[in-house]
Amino acid sequence: MKALFEARINFIVTEKQIKRVRAPNEDWLQDDEVDVVLRFSNVVKLMNGIQNVQKLYLTADTIEVLSLCCESVPLFNNLKTLGITSEEGRGWQAMPVLGLLHYMTDKCGDACDCISREDKGRSLTSCPVKKLEIRGFRGTMKEMTMIKHFLVYFPCLKEMNIYVEEYDPTELRFPQVSKVIIQMMEEYNKLSSCNVQLLITDYLSEKWTAAGRIL
């Protein structure tokens, strides 16, 4: 897979499987539960095999599994575009290589309050990523903090597209919250050379228009 240009990784897991993987060393794990842990432990080989890709897209479940099963992630020297999906209840912000926030899991990245100020952002400073996509955005302050972290520490980042969650209720359903989020996005654009865009799909646009809402 050395010549692979683009990779989209989506591990399909259940809540029960995530719970098992989060506690792989517990004595009470039954044989079928141990099999789940062992199966996900092979993801290290997968990541090593795709480390030359230029475009990489990871779902929330995938990043949760990576953060729990991989002690380290290979350096993606050729990576230009990174797409990640945010999902409530998943540790998408627990992937240390991205410097993400400690939230749902017992591992944290260098944006976390657990990390000293001088060490924050260290894992991103040599990253060549120029474009970042975030999907499933819900308008929370945790997400906004993470977005600011990316803007500060990704040296090559030129474009960030943030897609609002389509189906589930988000904080953006409240007009006051939407106004604050838009103001913060505008401020991020002023302070950074990166073009930050908050985007909605056609489906969500039609849905909000029918409800008399405008972002």
Swiss-Prot record:
Disulfide bonds: none annotated. Residues 122-199 form the FBD domain. InterPro entries: FBD, FBL60-like. PANTHER family: RNI-LIKE SUPERFAMILY PROTEIN (PTHR31293:SF16). This is FBD domain-containing protein At3g58975. It comes from Arabidopsis thaliana (Mouse-ear cress).
